[in-house]
Amino acid sequence: MTTTATVTTALNHVELVYAPGERALARALFELLGCGIHDSGGPFLSAKIAPGQDTLVNNAMYASEVTPEQWALEQALRDALDGGTLAAPGGDYIANLEAHPQRSCHFGISYPSAEELDATIERIEHAAEHTPGLAGRVSVSGVFRPGDPGSYTDTMTQAFIRTDVIASGLLAFGQHIELQWQVA
C-alpha cells in the first residue's frame, strides 16, 4: 500500500521583533497565547502555535530583538507620537485600531475549542497578575461572537488582543493578534 501526502500551501510562520531587553516579556506573551516555547539562547525566540507539534519550521512565530537601525527609528517615531508632529494623527490612528480591530494589520491564531479560546482570553485579561512587566502592555481589544454587535461573521468567534511587546513591523503602533475559534 502506498500512502500519498497531500501537499498544500500554507502560511508557515510570522516573524516578529521585540524591544531591547524585552525577550522575557516576548516569551511570557507567547506563553499567554498557549504556545510551546523553544529558546536556545540564540538570536531567535521560537514559539510553536500548537505546543505538541514536532517542528519549528511551520506553524510557528519567531521573535528577535530589533536591529539598532529599527530601534533608532522607533525612538524617533515615539517622540513624534508623544506630543510631537504625529501626536494627533497617530492618536487618531491608534484609537481607530482599538475601536475596529478587525480592520487592523494583524495575524490570527485558531484554537481547537471555544473553551481553549476563552481560557486564553482569561489569561490575557489577568496577564499583569502573573507577569507584572506585561501590565499595560497587552490587552483584549474586543471579543466578537457570532451574532454579537460588531461581529463580521457567524462562522467564528474572534478575539483581538493588542500588544506593544512584539510586532511584525514597528513596535510604536503595537500589534493586533486575532484569536479565533471556528464554529463547526
Q: Language-model features: where?
A:
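Acidic, proline/glycine-rich low-complexity IDRs
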Residues: 149-184
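A common structural junction motif
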Residues: 34-37, 125-137
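Vicinal oxygen chelate
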Residues: 9-21, 74-82, 95-124
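Charged, glycine/proline-rich intrinsically disordered loops and linkers
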Residues: 62-94
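Short proline/glycine- and acidic-rich turn/helix-capping motifs at secondary-structure junctions
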Residues: 137-154
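Hydrophobic side chains in beta-strands
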Residues: 16, 63, 109, 161-163, ...
